[in-house]
């Protein structure tokens, strides 16, 4: 687990992963970005399910725009769009039913933003991230800080069978 300042520093690396930069929300660019993102947000909410909206977590160095009592950035809009597309494709049904516990597998989990988004919507799901070790370290640090009471599991090559042991109790798994 990390403190808010450390996670904010780690989020700076997120711009290389997702292209979203804190600097776009300050200074000269801020108004242009705000207009574009507000327009995009309203369009997405018009066509998507508002129940799938999750605010950007401000507590850990989150950044973005405040509008209509929501806090968001480009990643938030992307995550909302993906959640709506999954919903439209009827792929979220399994996550709404609590038994058996469903697993979502994200390949190349980035900095953990979508994992946070998804687990906020579906806390009883198991979220598996497979990625290179550097990304696993980044996403695990972020998620362990946001979800301090969650159960985490890391793949151990010396004991691969242990990874699946008591799978129904795991919130986040990394391999």
Regions found by a protein language model. Give the residues of each.
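Short alpha-helix immediately C-terminal to the canonical SAM-binding loop
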Residues: 136-137
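Conserved Class I S-adenosyl-L-methionine-dependent methyltransferase catalytic core
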Residues: 1-98
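P-loop NTPase catalytic core of nucleic-acid-dependent motor ATPases
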Residues: 82, 101, 118
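S-adenosyl-L-methionine
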Residues: 142-175
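Conserved class I S-adenosyl-L-methionine
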Residues: 99-110
